[in-house]
Each structure stands twice: as structure tokens, then as C-alpha cells.
Amino acid sequence: MDTTGRLHHRKHATPVEDRSPTTPKASDALPLPLYLTNAVFFTLFFSVAYYLLHRWRDKIRNSTPLHIVTLSEIVAIVSLIASFIYLLGFFGIDFVQSFIARASHDVWDLEDTDPNYLIDEDHRLVTCPPANISTKTTIIAAPTKLPTSEPLIAPLVSEEDEMIVNSVVDGKIPSYSLESKLGDCKRAAAIRREALQRMTRRSLEGLPVEGFDYESILGQCCEMPVGYVQIPVGIAGPLLLNGREYSVPMATTEGCLVASTNRGCKAIYLSGGATSVLLKDGMTRAPVVRFASATRAAELKFFLEDPDNFDTLAVVFNKSSRFARLQGIKCSIAGKNLYIRFSCSTGDAMGMNMVSKGVQNVLEFLQSDFSDMDVIGISGNFCSDKKPAAVNWIEGRGKSVVCEAIIKEEVVKKVLKTNVASLVELNMLKNLAGSAVAGALGGFNAHAGNIVSAIFIATGQDPAQNVESSHCITMMEAVNDGKDLHISVTMPSIEVGTVGGGTQLASQSACLNLLGVKGANKESPGSNSRLLAAIVAGSVLAGELSLMSAIAAGQLVKSHMKYNRSSKDMSKAAS
């Protein structure tokens, strides 16, 4: 038996059985299929109604009192009442209940044959039908405090595993050493998971542990795993970019984000596609060194920025990797401290490790001529990694990309449900002036971070680098005598790679393969990562176009008034 297979089974309190009788339904009137039952009662209702009206007309003509009825008329009246009660019970009550339940789920009635779209400021776009809402009341057992002497889940299969769990709980075996001691990553994760539950008295029942290759993350992706988190992946597209179509995978838990981006992709596709240009490709790392005086720090600055010394430094730097190629060095002084920003190409890797190795080589080389140099840190935040910084916004980091498209007037009206003038005005006041009022740094856009983070998670990028990768300025202007819309996004610091890190995981590798950028491009090193950056920019272009159109169309207030999503979520949580 699989050792970890039983780890999912917790010891539960005996549930309270719901023995309440099933509520009878109108459709139970006849032991027939529902559509036949409905047909019978529809026919009965209209036929007896016609018969009674015909009989009463004859009585009026013959001056016969209406209250005098024959046996056939009595049967007809009873049949009319019975069929009316059935139809009211089947359609009337169910209609009212479904109408109430549907009040916060209906999609907008757009004049398009494609799925309707609903977008709000949080980029939630409703396309799915409402989930069935059960009105049946169930009794839930009150949570009981777990005894400290029993495990939260069924005991492990082998006595050896039980002993290891107890040793981890008692602190005799470090949790981080399980993989090396056991030689089985999956078994180590299961034992660590059980030990964690016993130590914290908290269940991890909803966190899956089976179905994951723990060997693939050992020593490179995650330490001390106890399971993995599931995130749904949706597909937006096709995105027509530079003459090619791409189906864009987006991993997100934000409802309607994928559908919103999909609508933008549709508008771009119907307008002839988008075009992207790579402006720069270079990862950076900036160590901080200190001298006894600012004069000495300035001497190193002049040495590093002297073009005559670049080739020598490049040879030293490039020894770190066959893909690393030093592009430039920029320095900044703060007192007697010197910040040195190295920039280099990194092939298809995102390149943080690669550039760090090159920087280390150069620092060791400089020690011969600047022995008084004190290396404070390999990173001095002049890089700047995983934080908003003007240096990335101005100089760029990773891939710098600009992507543009011209959206036709009829597409703006039919697909986006707005007009060019409104979009241009909104972009000026919201993305440009509004962001300036807010003191934004690289945030001159509507929601670039939404699309960037969703693609990053799906393709195995570093989610934390969404901070600088989402730096974007969205521009819109009317062209072709004001009929069409020119839209562009300029993103100076998209940090992506197609090898290394999370890109080698099975799910993320599959998403990269879907885009045609899996792994390294042996014929043209770096082309896969550059293409991925272009796809990210194109997807951001689609997302910006769709959300801005929804805002320009004035649908935000309508969506919040009609679809009270927060109230719906609260009611679910309360139930």
C-alpha cells in the first residue's frame, strides 16, 4: 500500500445525517418524463379552458344560468384547476426562485453573437452561467477540539514512518533533512506534512500532496514541501501578434480576467493584429562596495566607465557562462559608497544567477588594483530587483518591449461597445494624468499587472518580478481622421526566461510549449525568451484595451449595482 496514500484521510467527527423528507415537486404529479408531464398538463389546461368557454357561450345564448353545470363541466372545471395548480407550481415558484438566485449572476445583454463580457475596475468579467444555488438546509457538525494525543489523519502505514514523524515532532530530526535521509522526496513530503499537522493541530486536508513530482523541485524550486497549490489556467486568444497567432495561458483566481483579455484579443484580431518591437535585452545586477573615502570610490567609477577598460572587464565577466555577454556598466556614488550596475545578455534564461556569477568574477578581478575595496553586498538595490524603481523605468531591465495596434472604428463600436473619442479622453485622464496625480512610478496603465502575473504563474516565471515587469505606459490616440484608435503599451522591464527556475515544472513547461517557447532555442539563443516577452506585452495590450473600453462605456457602476459579487461571496461564506 502507498505510504502517503492514506495521508488524505482525516479522522472526522460523525456527521449529523440529514433525515428531512424530500420536498415534493410539481413535476412528481405523473410518473413520466418531465417533458411529457408538462405536455399533458399544458394540453389539459388549454383544452378544458376552451371547452368551458365554449359551453358558457352557449349558455349565454340560450339564457341558461351559468351556475347550473353538468357532470362533464364539473370534470372540466376540476381538470382546469388541477392543471393550473400544476403549472403554477412548476413554473411560477421555480421561476421566482431562479430569478432571485440569478439576480447577481446574469451577464450583460450585449449585441454580439459571441460570449458576453462584463468588466469592472478589478477586471472581473462574467461569462460563465450562474452556479446552481441549493436552497436545501443542511446541518453541519460543530467543530470539535482535536485531542492532542491523536494524529489529525490516519496513522502512516509503516512503523518506521510513524517513528520518523514522532522524531520530527520531537525535534530529533530536522524537517529540512528528510529528503537527504530518506532518499525519497515524495515520502519526505508526506512525513513532513503529517508532522506539521500534529505540531500545529491544524489540518492540511484541502492541500493536495499526491500527483506531483517532488524530485523535480529538489534543490531548485522549493524547500521543505508539504504539497502544492492548484491554480486554474484559462486561455485567452488567439492573439494575433507579428503575423502569428498565440493562445495565451493565464493562471489566475480572479474571475473574468481571462475573458476580459480574450475580448481584447478579439478586437486586435479583427483589426489586423498587433506589432511588437524589442528595444533592449539585458539583465542587471548592482553590487555595493565601500572605500575609505569618496575620492577613492570615484576613482573606481571612472575606471569602470572608461571605454578602454570595457573589453578587459567583459572577458572576466563572460567567463561565468557561454550565454552571458556583458553589455554595459553604470555607476552611482553615495558618499564613499559605489553602486555598480552591470547589464548583460543571458540567452533564454531570465539570468539573475548568470549575471550574479559574472559580477562576482569582476569584483574578484578588481581586488588586485583596488585592494581597499570592501564588498558590502552582491546586490545593492541599484539593480533593481522585485521592487518599483525609477532606474528600471528609465534604463530598463530584462526585455524592453513596445507593442501597438490600430483598432478599427467598427470593432471599437461592435466588440468594445464604445467609441474612439471616449477611449482617448479616458486614457489621458486616467492612465496619464490620474497616475501622475497618484505619484505612480511605472504605473501609467489600467491593469498591466493583472495580465503579467497571470502569464508569469502559468509559464513558471518569478511572480515577485511582476513588480517591475508590470511597469507600463498605455498610450491611445485617434488616427485616420479620428475614425480608428491607435493603442500602444511600452514596457521597459519584462523579466522572463524559458529555461531554469519554475519553467522546468511539468505544468509550466506545458504552457510554454503551447506558446512555442519551451526551453532554449539552440539555433538562436535568447529568441524564445524574447518572444515570450513580446507575447506578454501583446496580452497586456489586449487587457488594457478591454478594460478601458468597459470603463469608457460606463459599465462599472452598472456592473457593481447589478452584480453584487462581494455580497454573494459573503453569503456563501456564511452558509
Curated annotation (Swiss-Prot):
Source species of the chain: Hevea brasiliensis (Para rubber tree)
Record field: transmembrane: 29-49, 73-93, 531-551
Ranges for region Linker: 97-160
Taxonomic lineage: Eukaryota, Viridiplantae, Streptophyta, Embryophyta, Tracheophyta
Keywords: Endoplasmic reticulum, Glycoprotein, Isoprene biosynthesis, Membrane, Mitochondrion, NADP, Oxidoreductase, Plastid, Transmembrane, Transmembrane helix
Pathway membership, UniProt: Metabolic intermediate biosynthesis; (R)-mevalonate biosynthesis; (R)-mevalonate from acetyl-CoA: step 3/3
Protein name per the record: 3-hydroxy-3-methylglutaryl-coenzyme A reductase 1
Family designation: Belongs to the HMG-CoA reductase family.
Active site (record annotation): 254 (charge relay system), 386 (charge relay system), 462 (charge relay system), 560 (proton donor)
EC number: 1.1.1.34
